[in-house]
């Protein structure tokens, strides 16, 4: 059933924006950023939108979902675990990202990876990994597995 505010369908995220120092949007660093996103996640530069040292937009497989990078004199700074997330449709897709990230890290040690792990909530198993490269925010990728006969969720006991 549709939400009453959105009878045409649920809204969805369409982009994430981050500010960077202009040097990171210069030709060499921009090329490194594009290589990571293309080789690991399959995202492509929207070259017609690129402005050297000013703007880079990466299409997240479809043109209406993207990462928007813009230069700023006072660029974004955040802790490593501040992140944005994507979902994939299979555990094999997620494992593929892990494999490509590991391969990419062999040639560029700036890639940081928190390996594939699973959080079993009983009704859903959330498989995820975290990967970052150059940008201030980390990317989390998840696959949600819904078991046929889920266990009831039991919250962890709190220490007292």
Predicted features and spans:
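A short, terminal or domain-edge coil/loop segment
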Residues: 63-74, 96-112
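Short, well-ordered turn and helix-capping elements at secondary-structure junctions
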Residues: 20-22, 71-73, 117
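Secondary-structure boundary/capping residues
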Residues: 25, 46, 93, 110-111
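Vicinal oxygen chelate
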Residues: 1-26, 76-160
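A short, hydrophobic/aromatic-rich structural module that often spans a beta strand
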Residues: 46, 52-87, 93, 156
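Core segments of cupin and vicinal oxygen chelate
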Residues: 18-66
